[in-house]
Structure formats: C-alpha cells, structure tokens
C-alpha cells in the first residue's frame, strides 16, 4: 500500500530531524533546509526535474550534484536518499514537517497578528515576545494580517490559542451585555 503525502513527509521529516539531532548539527541542517525550501519554491522546476520518471538516474544525480555542493554532508546525504527512493516530489512537505519538529523542540511558535493597521517589525516582535513569555515559549514569529473591520486592537492566533483583543469584539461583548440587561 502506498503511503500518503503526509505519511511520507512525517517519516522523512522525522528521520532527518533525528539524524541531525543525533549528529549535533540540528541548527545547521535547519538553516540549510530553510534555504533549500526558499530556493525550491522560487524555482519549482528543480523538483520537477528530480522527480521526473522519464529522466534516468544518472542525469538526475548529475543535476543534484550541481545543486547540493553548497550544502553540508548531512543535507547532501539526505537529498541523495530522497533521489534514491524517488521522494523528491515531497521535498517541501518533508522540510515543513522537519521544521515543525525543530520548532517544537526549540519552543518556537508561529502565528498571526490581525490588526486594523499594519504593524512595524518592532511592534510585531514585542507582541510575539509578550506572547512567548506568557505561554513559556522561546520565540513567537508573527505575521501581520491587516483587517480594518476589527476597528482597532489585535487578534493573536498562535497554534491553538486565539486572543481577541479587537475593538470589534469588545463592542460586541458590550452590546451583548446591554441586550442581556434589558
């Protein structure tokens, strides 16, 4: 029975994570995999070529060798493993799964700060730092989403937590109180 995309990503992501952690190169491998992901997203033809069933193994290996020369032995070995087992089509999913494991280990979370106006980097950092401190995390990376309909304040969504400090929500609560009192 064939594995689903999620199962392949989970297995290979966990294998890479375990290998990098055991060899004490986790941070370096993480950095390289994030760079690789950016490059592959910018140039999706790389995955197309390396997962093309028509191309022979030698041509794929030659192509991969040209790409991987800037990476560590660990990442090179992993990329060769993906090529050998014909898993290159799953590369971005594998990297994403690896990143989830890395973030969990390092108490890093990502989320969204929805505001009525755009926040600058310093404001986002302070919001993230405050959330991280409150929820015992090392780092919270926030992306700013602008939604003028919330009127003001901020809605923070990080992992499974939502903190709605928007003016719209506060007005809604006040309205509900007034209606309940009458």
From Swiss-Prot:
Keywords noted in UniProt: ATP synthesis, Cell membrane, CF(1), Hydrogen ion transport, Ion transport, Membrane, Transport
A Pfam family annotated for this UniProt entry: OSCP
Nucleus listed as a keyword: no
Membrane-protein topology: Peripheral membrane protein
Example of a GO MF term: proton-transporting ATP synthase activity, rotational mechanism
UniProt xrefs under SUPFAM superfamilies: N-terminal domain of the delta subunit of the F1F0-ATP synthase (SSF47928)
Keyword Nucleotidyltransferase belongs to the record: no
Gene3D superfamilies linked to this entry: N-terminal domain of the delta subunit of the F1F0-ATP synthase
Family: Belongs to the ATPase delta chain family.
Quaternary structure and partners: F-type ATPases have 2 components, F(1) - the catalytic core - and F(0) - the membrane proton channel. F(1) has five subunits: alpha(3), beta(3), gamma(1), delta(1), epsilon(1). F(0) has three main subunits: a(1), b(2) and c(10-14). The alpha and beta chains form an alternating ring which encloses part of the gamma chain. F(1) is attached to F(0) by a central stalk formed by the gamma and epsilon chains, while a peripheral stalk is formed by the delta and b chains.
Matches recorded under NCBIfam families: ATP_synt_delta, PRK05758.2-4
Protein name: ATP synthase subunit delta
């Amino acid at each position: 029975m064939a594995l689903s995309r999620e199962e392949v990503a989970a297995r290979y992501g966990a294998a890479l994570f375990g290998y990098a952690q055991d060899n004490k190169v986790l941070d370096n491998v993480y950095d390289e995999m994030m760079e690789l992901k950016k490059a592959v997203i910018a140039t999706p033809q790389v995955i197309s070529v390396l997962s093309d069933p028509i191309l022979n193994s030698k041509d794929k290996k030659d192509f991969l060798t040209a790409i991987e020369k800037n990476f560590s032995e660990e990442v090179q070995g992993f990329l060769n493993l993906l090529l050998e087992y014909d898993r290159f089509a799953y590369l971005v999913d594998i990297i994403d799964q690896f990143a989830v494991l890395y973030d969990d280990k390092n108490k890093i979370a990502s989320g969204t700060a929805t505001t009525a106006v755009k926040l600058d980097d310093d404001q986002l950092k302070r919001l993230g730092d405050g959330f991280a401190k409150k929820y015992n995390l090392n780092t919270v990376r926030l992306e700013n989403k602008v939604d003028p309909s919330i009127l003001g304040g901020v809605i923070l969504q990080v992992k499974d937590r939502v903190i709605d400090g928007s003016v719209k929500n506060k007005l809604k609560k006040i309205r509900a109180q007034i209606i309940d009192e009458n």
